[in-house]
Amino acid sequence: MNIQALMQQAQTMQKKVEANVENAKKDLANKEVHAEAGSGLVKVTMTGRHVVKRLTIDPSLLEDEPDMIEDLIAAAINDAVRQADELYETTMAGATSGMGLPPGMQGMF
């Protein structure tokens, strides 16, 4: 195999990876994760791209101390971020699978 053919093969692979990654990013924007804190008193819905779509606070919490509400909101959002990160890793691994990329390179996207 000559160098020109090798370069063309690398270019083709790069375009395919870029297209797959772009499709995966669009897919992540449409997927949602759901998290909660305080046994469901605070609920968060977030996209796979870390956009908070909904935040629900049980009315009973509004009578309590603001510190408790703030802690539960932070916990729910942090859980949603963790789930969105896992969704991202899984989706990107799928987008670049079968491409023969070296280990660790999938996480670069």
From Swiss-Prot:
<protein>
    <recommendedName>
        <fullName>Nucleoid-associated protein Psyc_0793</fullName>
    </recommendedName>
</protein>
<dbReference type="InterPro" id="IPR036894">
    <property type="entry name" value="YbaB-like_sf"/>
</dbReference>
<dbReference type="InterPro" id="IPR004401">
    <property type="entry name" value="YbaB/EbfC"/>
</dbReference>
<comment type="similarity">
    <text>Belongs to the YbaB/EbfC family.</text>
</comment>
<comment type="function">
    <text>Binds to DNA and alters its conformation. May be involved in regulation of gene expression, nucleoid organization and DNA protection.</text>
</comment>
<dbReference type="GO" id="GO:0043590">
    <property type="term" value="C:bacterial nucleoid"/>
</dbReference>
<dbReference type="GO" id="GO:0003677">
    <property type="term" value="F:DNA binding"/>
</dbReference>
<keyword id="KW-0963">Cytoplasm</keyword>
<comment type="subunit">
    <text>Homodimer.</text>
</comment>
<dbReference type="Pfam" id="PF02575">
    <property type="entry name" value="YbaB_DNA_bd"/>
</dbReference>
<dbReference type="GO" id="GO:0005829">
    <property type="term" value="C:cytosol"/>
</dbReference>
<keyword id="KW-0238">DNA-binding</keyword>
